[in-house]
Regions:
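N- or domain-start disorder-to-order transition segments that initiate the globular core
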Residues: 9-49
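Glycine-rich loop at the start of a catalytic domain that most often binds anionic cofactors/ligands
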Residues: 68-80, 103-110
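Internal helix-turn-beta structural module
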Residues: 307-354
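A contiguous, surface-oriented mixed alpha/beta subdomain in the mid-to-C-terminal portion of proteins
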Residues: 236-238, 243, 251-266
Length: 362
């Protein structure tokens, strides 16, 4: 029955149709090489999480992607280091297209690919998928953060590892998403530094769920998931207090054990652990490498923000951006990235000597 009252969409000023995921897949199909890269990396990460593989997972790359050309150059460089250190590290490139904002700001390449507030999301989805096809086809597995709950249908077949950020770890929708995606997932501790929410999220994501979402055809549907066994915690610090140190690792491992979860811990070298100073990631890396070298198998992975050029830059209208430099959080430059990766690889080799049976991972 019609009514003279309008109660809906009162704050919506425009609605544009978005291209269906299946059409983007058909337009930019996954290649055999990309599929092989992604499937192999997922299995290797699973083996690291179960203790069958004693390497350390390294998720490394730009804070966010804004220039696909620079991203591909970074991927080519990283692939060479990945191959060189493959016996000790599993290196996966951080390819982040969505940025959670504390208040407002540029939300990432998918949301605003032209960096001009035109919000051409259809273009952003295509650029993101094309970049992932290119990167994974060259043998470089990709990692991303799942922020929007619809965009995974456009890109998830090309993702080897995913993150749920500190601001969304408590979200029921993201826990449900994590229970159904085909890749391993890391949950970050809260922005205030507490870990219980992340531990709860791990338990939730390991369980089956039933929820509403969109199919690749773009239709609303009820999704039923099996649960995801390949989930773990990421320590990123909080309230300007780091939690990468050995005492914090022990406390988190104990919290995981009390929840009957395997003590798999990834450490984010950036964010509150670096006090938001990108070069301090090297200090964090030195400390974490020492913990690994002394035999701690609970540290199964690390996350690093790195780019071709160090630091970050602000967008200035009419001014060309510096090639290969972040426009969001500051990153390590390439000249610091390679030595850090070698330091981590050396730590893994020392761990094999110090604790060959992995007895510190209970």
């Amino acid at each position: 029955m019609q009514t003279k009252y309008n109660t809906d969409d009162l704050r919506i000023c425009e609605i544009k149709e978005v291209i269906a995921p299946i059409l983007v897949h058909e337009e930019l199909p996954i290649t055999d090489a990309a599929a092989e890269t992604t499937l192999a990396a997922r299995k290797e990460i699973h083996n690291i999480l179960t203790g069958a593989d004693d390497r350390v997972l390294v998720v490394i790359g730009p804070c966010s992607i804004h220039d696909p050309v620079a991203a591909k150059e970074y991927a080519q460089r990283l692939k060479a280091v990945k191959d060189e250190l493959k016996d000790d590290l599993l290196i996966v490139m951080r390819v982040y297209f969505e940025k959670p904002r504390t208040t407002v700001g540029w939300k990432g390449l998918i949301n605003d690919p032209d960096l001009d507030s035109s919000f051409n999301i259809n273009k952003g989805l295509r650029i993101a998928r094309q970049l992932l096809v290119d990167v994974t086809s060259m043998g470089m597995p990709a990692a991303t953060e799942y922020l929007d709950l619809i965009s995974p249908q456009y890109i998830s077949d090309l993702i080897a590892w995913g993150a749920i950020g500190a601001r969304t770890t408590e979200s029921q929708g993201h826990r449900e998403l994590a229970s159904g995606v085909s890749c391993p997932i890391g949950f970050k501790n809260s922005t205030d530094g507490t870990i219980k929410i992340a531990i709860d999220a791990i338990g939730a994501a390991m369980s089956p769920h039933h929820f509403l979402s969109l199919t690749k055809m773009g239709h609303s549907a009820i999704f039923s998931t099996t649960g995801n066994e390949d989930v773990h915690i990421i320590l990123r610090g909080g309230n300007d207090r780091p939690n990468y140190d050995a005492v914090s690792v022990e406390q988190v491992a104990e919290g995981l054990r009390k929840a009957n979860l395997r003590p798999n811990i990834m450490i984010d070298f950036s964010h509150a652990n670096s006090l938001k100073q990108c070069q301090r990631q090297l200090i964090v890396g030195e400390d974490v490498s020492a913990q690994i070298a002394h035999g701690d198998h609970r540290i199964m992975g690390v996350m690093v923000e790195s780019n071709l050029k160090a630091g970050s830059q602000k967008q200035v209208e009419g001014q060309e951006l510096v090639y290969g430099q972040s426009i969001t959080d500051g990153c390590l430059g390439w000249e610091d990235t390679v030595p850090l990766l070698h330091e981590l690889a050396e730590a893994v080799r020392k761990r094999r000597v110090a604790n060959p049976d992995g007895s510190l991972k209970i």
